[in-house]
């Protein structure tokens, strides 16, 4: 019985030591509030009138493109020093619709990532 206990203790110790030498893959996740990322097109059923060219924010295509550019620069820089491949998962808030997210990930700063 003692030999059996010693054997399993040795086997378990070797297994732990071998497992410690395995290579690890690092992934990064982030959450970012995009702060009212709206395009200039009205979506039926949504209260997005402030973000139209004649709305209270005078939201234009130029402003929209500038915001996309700036946000894509920031998001692509997150965790770049830790993980060269970039973020594995990005959670976002305050986005108008799927089309706006597609525009964001199509920006040159984010085009090389697999979104």
Q: What is the predicted role of each segment?
A:
Residues 19-114:
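N-terminal, active-site-proximal structural segment of metallo-dependent hydrolase catalytic domains
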Residues 1-22:
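Bacterial Sec-dependent N-terminal signal peptides
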